[in-house]
Swiss-Prot record:
The lineage of its organism: Bacteria, Pseudomonadati, Campylobacterota, Epsilonproteobacteria, Campylobacterales. 5-phospho-alpha-D-ribose 1-diphosphate binds at R78, R103, D130, P131, M132, F133, A134, T135, G136, G137, T138, D199. It catalyses: UMP + diphosphate = 5-phospho-alpha-D-ribose 1-diphosphate + uracil. The gene is upp. It comes from Campylobacter curvus (strain 525.92). GO terms for molecular function: GTP binding; magnesium ion binding; uracil phosphoribosyltransferase activity. This is Uracil phosphoribosyltransferase.
């Protein structure tokens, strides 16, 4: 899977260990999701385009570079809202395009229910964020929706992923890079990631 980027860093691994722990409290879980996302966004944005500008410092005029790429952050509701602030902190001029998917517990499939994109979405790099990448179904549907709305540049950031979902996604969208901090063992019979960390949305919003 050439499009999958596993981000390995001692700080991320340390925070992941606490994030996975079932005894980690919701307030700490939210903080860890935010911090891990903060660290991951650096790697995912490594190839953004820059433009040269002239800056007047207190001492002299110098050349500098600023972002030329316009970014649209696309959190998948609701769990990804826990990742949004950290990305905004790094890219404050980004726009947000909301994508709403809800898991159907009977079918274990994600059902689309809401979308709100900025008017200039098609001219932006879309960075989809979702803490869990399980079957790949939500990711596939999210990319399909963006492509149908003329968004050409897309990346995906997920904290934990399952190999089954990554393989399925990569077969359909080999051109979309996926950044993850961990590739776990497998999916269980309910399509939950093993060992995983449970339901990220419930743990972020304390609705267990």
């Amino acid at each position: 899977m050439k499009n999958v980027r596993l981000i390995s860093h001692p700080l991320i691994e340390h925070k992941l260990a606490i994030l996975r722990d079932k005894n980690t409290q919701p307030f700490q879980f939210r903080m860890l999701v935010d911090e891990i996302s903060h660290l991951m966004i650096f790697e995912a944005t490594r190839d953004l385009n820059l433009r040269e500008i002239s800056v007047q410092t207190p001492v002299a005029t110098t050349k500098a570079r600023k972002l030329a790429t316009k970014v649209m952050i696309c959190p998948i509701l609701r769990a990804a809202l826990g990742m949004l602030d950290s990305v905004f902190t790094i890219i404050p001029d980004a726009s947000v395009g909301f994508l709403g998917f809800q898991r159907n517990e009977k079918t274990a499939q994600a059902e689309f229910f809401y979308a709100k994109l900025p008017k200039d979405a098609k001219s932006r790099l879309a960075i989809i964020i979702d803490p869990m990448f399980a079957t790949g179904g939500t990711a596939i549907d999210a990319v399909k929706f963006l492509r149908e709305n003329s968004v050409k540049q897309i990346k995906f950031i997920s904290i934990i992923a399952a190999p089954e979902g990554l393989r399925r996604f990569s077969e359909i969208y080999p051109d979309v890079e996926v950044y993850t901090a961990a590739i776990d063992e497998r999916l269980n019979e309910k399509n939950y990631i093993v060992p995983g960390l449970g339901d990220a949305g419930d743990r972020v919003f304390n609705t267990l």
